[in-house]
């Protein structure tokens, strides 16, 4: 399975910066369907809690390699990616290997 993901959370962004990405369940469902159709993905999951928002997408490697989950999420929410890019943490998985950005104190970031 090929997966890319992105996360904006309290460790990199203030409450004010995260507000643009705060989502209620009905909006999450709407965005997931829109993203799936727009980008012809195999899968799409959005997780939104009080201190983080994540977008996980799945597609064939050839499709996924040209996609940025951060840009997709910003586009779907109509917020400028350039303004928020530095607050996001990317994740990547091709096949059986998963790569996270690891914080020096051994915490996932």
Where are these regions (language model features)?
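N-terminal ligand-binding/catalytic initiation module
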Residues: 1-109
């Amino acid at each position: 399975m090929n997966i890319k993901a992105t996360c904006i959370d309290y460790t990199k962004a203030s409450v004010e910066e995260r507000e643009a990405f705060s989502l209620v369940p009905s909006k999450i469902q709407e965005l997931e369907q829109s993203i799936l159709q727009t980008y012809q993905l195999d899968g799409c999951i959005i997780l939104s809690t009080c201190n983080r928002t994540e977008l996980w997408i799945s597609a064939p490697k050839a499709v996924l390699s040209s996609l940025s989950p951060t840009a997709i999420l910003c586009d779907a929410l109509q917020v400028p990616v350039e303004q928020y890019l530095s607050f996001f943490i990317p994740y990547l998985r091709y096949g059986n290997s998963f790569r996270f950005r690891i914080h020096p104190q051994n915490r996932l970031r």
